[in-house]
């Protein structure tokens, strides 16, 4: 299994970013927006799982990986959040308590800069997943644990924001696992165009039926 760059994933990520932008600028809440929201964020987590497998991350030093992920995901998150907090403080009355409240919310992933929740969510999910695959060598156990984690937020629905933050990571964990194990199928070209069409149709049906 080589570490040659999977260039086509750059195109997929570019397409995903375009879908994210469209999802945020498309005001009308109709079937198109529902469909976009059904997969444009999961797509990034699936790609993350594919890249974890492709780069043999589990065989590398986890401290260096975490440091690298922190620089690429958490540092940008902090910068965006500080900028958003600054704008918020300019537009509203500045108080130390308000500043403390805003910073605390950002640390707890109650983001001021909208979709930036994705960055710490991806960081936390990848770190936990790396720890899991380094310690759980049995693929069946890993998949089973991932499935349980993925199903928890689907069963225990909540309106509490801080629980929603945690549940986002749980759902992301499931998609990262899917990408990790889909890697071999992609490399061996076992996922044919026929199966992609089936997945595409299934995605449309499920997204519309679940809203």
Regions found by a protein language model. Name each.
Residues 1-211:
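Alpha-helical transmembrane segments and their immediate juxtamembrane cytosolic regions
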């Amino acid at each position: 299994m080589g570490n040659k760059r999977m260039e086509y994933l750059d195109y997929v990520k570019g397409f995903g970013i375009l879908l994210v932008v469209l999802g945020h600028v498309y005001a009308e809440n109709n079937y198109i927006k529902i469909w976009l929201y059904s997969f444009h964020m999961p797509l990034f987590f699936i790609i993350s799982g594919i890249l974890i497998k492709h780069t043999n991350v589990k065989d590398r030093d986890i401290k260096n990986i975490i440091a690298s992920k922190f620089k690429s995901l958490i540092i940008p998150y902090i910068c965006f959040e500080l900028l958003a907090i600054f704008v918020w403080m300019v537009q509203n009355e500045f108080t130390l308590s308000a500043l403390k409240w805003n910073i605390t919310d950002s640390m707890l992933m109650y983001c001021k800069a909208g979709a930036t929740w994705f960055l710490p969510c991806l960081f936390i999910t990848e770190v936990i997943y790396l720890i899991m695959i380094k310690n759980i060598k049995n693929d069946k156990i890993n998949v089973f644990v991932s499935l349980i984690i993925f199903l928890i937020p689907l069963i225990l629905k909540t309106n509490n924001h801080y629980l929603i933050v945690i549940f986002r990571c749980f759902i992301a964990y499931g998609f990262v696992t899917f990408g990790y194990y889909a890697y071999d199928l992609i490399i061996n070209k076992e996922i044919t165009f026929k199966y992609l069409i089936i997945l595409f149709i299934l995605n449309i049906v499920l997204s519309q039926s679940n809203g």
